[in-house]
Amino acid sequence: MANNNSNSPTGPHFLFVTFPAQGHINPSLELAKRLAGTISGARVTFAASISAYNRRMFSTENVPETLIFATYSDGHDDGFKSSAYSDKSRQDATGNFMSEMRRRGKETLTELIEDNRKQNRPFTCVVYTILLTWVAELAREFHLPSALLWVQPVTVFSIFYHYFNGYEDAISEMANTPSSSIKLPSLPLLTVRDIPSFIVSSNVYAFLLPAFREQIDSLKEEINPKILINTFQELEPEAMSSVPDNFKIVPVGPLLTLRTDFSSRGEYIEWLDTKADSSVLYVSFGTLAVLSKKQLVELCKALIQSRRPFLWVITDKSYRNKEDEQEKEEDCISSFREELDEIGMVVSWCDQFRVLNHRSIGCFVTHCGWNSTLESLVSGVPVVAFPQWNDQMMNAKLLEDCWKTGVRVMEKKEEEGVVVVDSEEIRRCIEEVMEDKAEEFRGNATRWKDLAAEAVREGGSSFNHLKAFVDEHM
């Protein structure tokens, strides 16, 4: 069925294919580095879209010699820019993008697989991220084993699995009744605030739900599908057992570069150096989430009224939309800029892991993207959880209720239907993390930091799981 490495004198050759989003690229590249750098004889070809490469979404420097890079076309090599405003036009634009990526991606990756075979460097296993089921199809066409790299917590994988396997009606009913809850096998009690937003029919991105159904159905076509997950055994032990045994769950995280040498400097680091230990709020909502103008105003008010020093990262998201389509986030806060600059610092980019490991950081106000969530745990930093969409809702619940490293903001729906967290609520959460329960939250965060470090070092749970996965392809 599959290429057996016994016929290849050079060891296993893994093909990694990642969806063109930062939350997929970062953990994929880290896993590729670990395979190429720590597993004897393993080689990796890391394939990202041409658009991701052109936007410099990852670095090709300082990688093992056995890791090489390749590209595939997603049909939008200059980047996908949507001019969609309505839900219908947004759905159509995204659908067209996914269809074109499937068509062009299959063409270019087919060439890559065939070229490597001709040069006697055949791939022996394909690893792909969420939303790329066509890569699994391509692997089957070439009789190659494949593994899904799930870049969210195993708890979220379990929710999607159960939704599509017997619990769809129950979860949908719960999602439409705000006061109700549901208990899925081996998972904590869930409310509508906790489930991935794609499952809620009223959510503007609910049209993406079929892509996750396709993902689960694709896995079921395999006899014993393997799912590599960016988590570690000690973090989600109950959720590991919530999926049927024929789905082989392989926790290999946290897939972060656990650096201890922070030689990089910048103006923001010099600014942090002047602040007292655990005194600074670090605020970041990632590279995708765009806050409404009303929400930005409330956040500005909260930061100004708290009078605590803060470092706020507002990334440039203009590449996602056509020019002048909407007011930039930085422009939205211009009327508050003078007051903000008196207390804190607003930057367009920072080395987040470097910042989270700075002695001055006392709290991370985060959108709860999974990479950021893991970085908060690995750095031992308490959080104010401020989720926006998809898995971030569940990540926020895990941080607050299960791992107990912070608090989650309580949003409210205004008359016009807009969901906003007001400044008073943001301030309340900040004070709880920085003052009222600071010692408790930091103690819990430090515990997870130590467990994460143990998991990835030689002999740790994630190290051993990854080695066992590679051994299957030796």
From Swiss-Prot:
EC number annotated for this UniProt entry: 2.4.1.-
Domain of life (superkingdom): Eukaryota
Gene Ontology biological process: response to toxic substance
Keyword Disulfide bond appears in the UniProt entry: no
GO molecular function: UDP-glucosyltransferase activity
Binding residues annotated for UDP-alpha-D-glucose, in chain numbering: 287, 350-352, 367-375, 389-392
Top-rank EC class of the record's enzyme: transferase
Keywords of this entry: Detoxification, Glycosyltransferase, Transferase
Function summary: Glucosyltransferase that glucosylates kaempferol. Can glucosylate the phytotoxic xenobiotic compound 2,4,5-trichlorophenol (TCP).
PANTHER family referenced in this protein's UniProt entry, alphabetically: GLUCOSYL/GLUCURONOSYL TRANSFERASES, UDP-GLYCOSYLTRANSFERASE 75D1
Family indicated by similarity: Belongs to the UDP-glycosyltransferase family.
Name recorded for this polypeptide: UDP-glycosyltransferase 75D1
Native species: Arabidopsis thaliana (Mouse-ear cress)
